[in-house]
Structures are given as structure tokens and as C-alpha cells.
Amino acid sequence: MLRFLVFATLVLYGHSTQDFPETNARVVGGTEAGRNSWPSQISLQYLSGGSWYHTCGGTLIRQNWVMTAAHCVDSPKTFRVVVGDHNLSQNDGTEQYVSVQKIVVHPYWNSNNVAAGYDIALLRLAQSVTLNSYVQLGVLPQEGAILANDSPCYITGWGRTKTNGQLAQTLQQAYLPSVDYAICSSSSYWGSTVKNTMVCAGGDGVHSGCQGDSGGPLHCLVNGKYSVHGVTSFVSKQGCNVSRKPTVFTRVSAYISWINKTIASN
């Protein structure tokens, strides 16, 4: 039986801003996604006491590789990946369950300094999954691609629908338009906490990520196609849907070379 557990908060201490990052992100202010409408979305789960616990999201980028956040996997656990899922509390008949064989965390990731960036990891699966209408590979952006301000994006994930709210059992989605680096790094937003290797989205005080489903994708519409521009990283310690504190993501386009080299060498 699948159980849920919200990870302990990882807080960046000693930073100059009062708005400390909280690296547990779930979808707030969203709606239930259409069944398997985001077929590259995965559920990352770990084993404890004979039960599997959903802990993070992620993106299937090869048939045997998943992209997620480094902070999701930087403590030793037995992990598995579930693809083709929609309702975590029941068997939809479309799921595939695969063990994680190897975890590659970015070498510069520092769990004590979330604002430094590099919150990205790749998971090699024990076997390749089967692609079908419920399971597809996420499309990654070109290396160095930068989103224009206010680009249409969606965050997806399982979990809390409001700060301190109940966990959602079905996949949620929320519209989060991108916020460019110049705005997001300004003093009235995130300031120096945000780096140019990150993507900001949302910040309207209504829709956001929130505790528990980091690692999942930010899907953005560019030239008529959705691609995964972000890996959910952190939100404000003040709350999930705080105005002018957009959800912050690892910018995937900053790590394309690292992704390709890691997969090729493993």
C-alpha cells in the first residue's frame, strides 16, 4: 500500500534575505490534470517498513533515465520510479514500476546551500520502460535556451493544494507563467537568492508549488510545443503561494551538456 510522507524542510540558513528557500514543492491553486495528459511525469517513491512512499516528482527523459531534483535523492534510500500513474492511491492499470539502479547527483550540489543551484540529479532505471500513450519521454529545451518573461508554463505534481492543506491523490496542474531573471532577482522578488541557472514561475499569490513534490517538471509552451524547462526546486519559507515569491526551478537548459555526458558515460 502506498503511503505519503512529507520530507523534512531543507532551509538555507545564514542567507541575507528573510525569505528562506523551502525545498519541498507541491502544486497550490491548481486543478486535477487530465488522466495521463503529462505522460513524462513520474512518481519517485522510497521503501520504508515494507511500504512505498511518494516523495518527489520527476521527468522521464530516456526509457531508462529520469531527471529529478538533487535534494530528493541526496540521502541513502531504496527508490523506485512509477510511470504512467495518475491516482497514487489506486491501481490505474497503466502504471509501470521500475527500481532505481544508479543515482547521479550533480557534483556541485550542496544540500546546505540550496541557493547555489545545481539542484538536479539523474536516475538510471534497472530496466527500460515501455513507451505508450500513458508513458512518453519529456522534451528538453535546447542548451542555453532562455524563456521570455510571461511564457505560458504549467507545474505538475501530486500533493498539497494549499499551504498546510491535504495531500492530493491525483496528479495536479497549475498555470505558472515564467518570470524572467531580471525581475525574479530584483530586491522586491527573490533578490540574490535566485541565480541565472534557475527559472522562476508564478508569484501571483494564488498558484505555486508547495511542500512535498519537488523534482517534478515545469512544462513551458515554446513555438507551439511543450518542453520541460524546469525541475521544481524551492518556494518561500513564508508560505507556498506568496506574492512576488515565484516558485523556483532548476533551469534545465543550463544542464543539457551535463545531462548528455552523464547518460553517455553511465
Swiss-Prot record:
Stored Pfam families: Trypsin (PF00089)
Molecular function as annotated in GO: metal ion binding; serine-type endopeptidase activity
Enzyme Commission number: 3.4.21.36
InterPro entries named in the record: Peptidase_S1_Elastase_sf, Peptidase_S1_PA, Peptidase_S1_PA_chymotrypsin, Peptidase_S1A, Trypsin_dom, TRYPSIN_HIS, TRYPSIN_SER
Enzyme class, broadest EC rank: hydrolase
Reaction catalyzed: Hydrolysis of proteins, including elastin. Preferential cleavage: Ala-|-Xaa
Cofactor(s) the record lists: Ca(2+)
Gene behind the chain: CELA1
SUPFAM superfamilies: Trypsin-like serine proteases
Signal peptide limits: 1-16
Any GO BP annotation: Wnt signaling pathway
Domain (Peptidase S1): residue spans on this chain: 27-264
Principal subcellular localization: secreted
Record keywords, A-Z: Calcium, Disulfide bond, Glycoprotein, Hydrolase, Metal-binding, Protease, Secreted, Serine protease, Signal, Zymogen
Cofactor note: Binds 1 Ca(2+) ion per subunit.
Active-site feature positions: H71, D119, S214
Source domain of life: Eukaryota
Name under which the protein is recorded: Chymotrypsin-like elastase family member 1
Source species taxonomy: Eukaryota, Metazoa, Chordata, Craniata, Vertebrata
Function noted in UniProt: Serine proteases that hydrolyze many proteins in addition to elastin.
Binding site for Ca(2+): D85, N87, Q90, E95
Family indicated by similarity: Belongs to the peptidase S1 family. Elastase subfamily.
Cystine pairs: C56-C72, C153-C220, C184-C200, C210-C240
Subcellular location field: Secreted
Pro-peptide positions on chain: 17-26
Glycosylated position list: N87, N241, N260
GO cellular component, one term: extracellular space
